[in-house]
């Protein structure tokens, strides 16, 4: 895979950090976008957002991203959450949004329409009357906050908001005004 993007600055350490990050993501780009290439070699959809941003900046379009998004969708028939974590399913929506904005692959987006709409409807049903999220699945954001329920709630609230904004845009693009209005 050719490196299309690059970074350099007056601080050689920052340039080296960028190079190592790009190389690490490159190693993870196999048939799918693997996470933890030395460790568990799984498609952790919750971690794919920074990876897809890096892929787009460094390599441009790569089919491994769409294969990974499809794999996560196909392995998570609703109401099952991706990797068993509701935040990961929310990240899937945001990655769809970013990938579509960057690549404009309408055919790929259309192939996500039914699942996307069903997922957004599920999440819309997990909002309490006071506007707070009420996600029952594994309430996980990241390891440093795993034992902090208030921080997890705030994180899920924010991630849910961003996912609904992304979902509204995608559903509007797909001509699904009914689901867009739920967002």
What are these regions, as identified by a protein language model?
Residues 1-125, 130, 137:
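Substrate-binding groove/exosite segments of carbohydrate-active enzymes
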Residues 75-91, 106, 124-183:
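The feature captures the catalytic groove of carbohydrate-active enzymes
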């Amino acid at each position: 895979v050719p490196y299309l993007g690059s970074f350099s600055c007056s601080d050689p350490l920052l340039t080296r950090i960028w190079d190592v990050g790009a190389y690490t993501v490159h190693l993870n780009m196999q048939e799918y976008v693997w996470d933890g290439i030395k460790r568990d070699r799984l498609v952790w959809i919750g971690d794919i957002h920074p990876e897809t941003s890096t892929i787009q900046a460094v390599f441009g379009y790569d089919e491994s991203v769409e294969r990974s998004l499809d794999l996560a969708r196909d392995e998570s028939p609703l109401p099952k959450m991706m990797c068993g974590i509701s935040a990961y399913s929310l990240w899937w929506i945001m990655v769809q949004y970013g990938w579509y904005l960057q690549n404009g692959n309408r055919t790929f987006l259309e192939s996500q329409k039914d699942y996307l709409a069903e997922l957004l409807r599920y999440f819309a049903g997990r909002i309490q009357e006071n506007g707070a999220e009420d996600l029952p699945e594994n309430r996980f954001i990241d390891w440093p906050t795993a034992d902090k329920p208030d921080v997890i709630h705030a994180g899920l609230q924010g991630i849910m908001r961003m996912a609904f904004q992304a979902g509204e845009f995608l559903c509007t693009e797909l001509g699904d005004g009914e689901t867009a209005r739920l967002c």
